[in-house]
From Swiss-Prot:
This is NAD(P)H-quinone oxidoreductase chain 4, chloroplastic. Keywords: Chloroplast, Membrane, NAD, NADP, Plastid, Plastoquinone, Quinone, Thylakoid, Translocase, Transmembrane, Transmembrane helix. It comes from the Eukaryota. PANTHER family: NAD(P)H-QUINONE OXIDOREDUCTASE CHAIN 4, CHLOROPLASTIC, NADH-UBIQUINONE OXIDOREDUCTASE CHAIN 4.
């Protein structure tokens, strides 16, 4: 056990420092904004310091572990710990939340509450990625919902209440399955119930029971990921949310579902995962094609980007269901890569909206002349989204391809078919992304409007765009930095499977 409670401090600090903000005298919005940014930067520095000096790359076991008795009556522990699977997502959370706090500068209405909810989300997300106890995992999973619901319903667009209600119905409904799974797994087959993930990883279950648990967890994670057909809350939510909230949703929230699939479905229930993986592979392949085909039909800019997120999540599902070393590594790399790319695209969509106050693509056009910096950044990040070589998305998708090719589980004909359908999806991706860019930035529509003038991106927006672009290019050029974090953990997860 670790001597110093690093993870507890990292989890508790944002929400406790954020709650202080609610009691401070109101000194204007600027104070709240800078206070939040300072907390986020401090938290990110603290996390980086703790991991740099205490995390050993070549150790697949749990590190920085903490184990405190919390509720005696229920035998409930506060168990924290990280491994190669969670370290990348925790650092991604810190980075994206800090930039989202900077992106939220234009928010003036109830800014204290807005920034507090952001920090509460921050704590919930890091708590989820570092929890080593199933009930604690569930509590952190639920802690996330309330801030997102309030951020949607109070600072969204015209249909914000509809999209917030849809979000809470989908996610809270799926949480029932998660709770049943958590209680079922912990109470099964022993006199003393245990919620400890390390002990549960060595537990074996009857096949029927394992399949039931797997389906319960799969439904919960499929809503968050999202996996079709449980994805319909996502375009509505992204279409109405403020763009700083969209950055958190696309950058981190969707990754929680994928993380849960690996952490619980793959690690705790290997036999059921082995049985379900061909179906997941089919769903992931359909998802890539479906989202890439549906996206061009969206008039709303943010909804179109949301469908691109659904398409990218298809690659993660395929990587997870390939049950191979490259496949799972590629899925983890795609989780990190899409976290940056999705957040960046939503930020630039929001920056454009701040200027022209239009959300529908058929009303836009001709913006490239007036805002060349935003146009340049949007074009580069669209290229990153369509997996241009040299960007992080390309490496992730390529490794997932290798994962399918090297998989021992599937017949050659089925592998060829899956790769063929994925290739069609990759051809459709540039079509909707480049047509989106063309509708926004080329043509004459806005130039012909009277009083047509607005300023290009300021230093804040330029700094934000470049900050997200650098890791995308960095991972694209040197992916081994991210891959080396999780490689030992991936091997230990796959050691439970008989092929791979």
């Amino acid at each position: 056990m670790n001597d110093f409670p690093w993870l507890t401090i990292i989890v508790v600090f944002p929400i406790s420092a954020g709650s202080l903000m609610l009691f401070l005298p109101h000194r204007g919005n600027k104070v709240n904004k800078w206070y939040t940014i300072c907390i986020c930067i401090l938290e990110l520095l603290l996390t980086t310091y703790a991991f740099c000096y205490n995390f050993k790359m070549d150790d697949p076991l749990i590190q920085l572990s903490e184990d405190y008795k919390w509720i005696n009556f229920l035998d409930f522990y506060w168990r924290m710990g990280i491994d190669g699977l969670s370290i990348g997502t925790i650092l991604l959370t810190g980075f994206i939340t800090t930039l989202a706090a900077l992106a939220a500068f234009p928010v003036t209405r109830d800014s204290r509450l807005f920034h507090f909810l952001m920090l509460a989300m921050y704590s919930g997300q890091i708590g989820l990625f570092s929890s080593r106890d199933l009930l604690l995992f569930f509590i952190m999973w639920e802690l996330e919902l309330i801030p997102v619901y309030l951020l949607l319903s109070m600072w969204g667009g015209k249909k914000r209440l509809y999209s917030a209600t849809k979000f809470i119905l989908y996610t809270a409904g799926s949480s029932i399955f998660l709770l049943i799974g958590v209680l079922g797994i912990s109470l099964y087959g022993s006199n003393e119930p245990t919620l400890n993930l390390e002990l549960l990883a060595n537990q074996s279950y009857p096949v029927t029971l394992e399949i039931l648990f797997y389906i319960g967890f799969l439904i919960a994670f499929a809503v968050k990921s999202p996996i079709i057909p449980l994805h319909t809350w996502l375009p509505d939510t992204h279409g109405e949310a403020h763009y700083s909230t969209c950055m958190l949703l696309a950058g981190i929230l969707l990754k929680m579902g994928a993380y849960g699939l690996v952490r619980i479905n793959m690690e705790l229930l290997p036999h059921a995962h082995s049985m379900f993986s061909p179906w997941l592979m089919v769903v992931g392949t359909i998802q890539i094609i479906y989202a890439a085909s549906t996206s061009p039909g969206q008039r709303n800019l943010k909804k179109r980007i949301a469908y691109s997120s659904v398409s990218h999540m298809g690659f993660i599902i395929i990587g997870i269901s390939s049950i191979t070393d490259p496949g799972l590594n590629g899925a983890i790399l795609q989780i990190i890569s899409h976290g940056f790319i999705g957040a960046a695209l939503f930020f630039l969509a929001g920056a454009s909206y701040d200027r022209i106050r239009l959300v529908y693509l058929d009303e836009m056009g001709g913006m490239a002349i007036s805002i060349p910096k935003i146009f340049t950044m949007f074009t580069i990040l669209s290229m990153a989204s369509l997996a241009l070589p040299g960007m992080s998305g390309f490496v992730a998708e390529l490794i997932v391809f290798f994962g399918i090719i090297t998989s021992q589980k599937y017949f050659l004909i089925s592998k060829i078919l899956i790769i063929f359908v994925m290739a069609i999806g990759m051809i459709l991706t540039p079509i909707y992304l480049l047509s989106m860019s063309r509708q926004m930035f080329y043509g004459y529509k806005l130039i012909n409007v009277k009083n047509f003038s607005f300023f290009d991106s300021g230093p804040r927006e330029l700094f934000l765009s470049i900050s997200i672009l650098l890791p995308i290019i960095g991972i694209g050029i040197y992916p081994d930095f991210v891959l080396s974090l999780a490689s030992d953990k991936v091997e230990s997860i796959l050691s439970n499977y008989f092929y791979g």
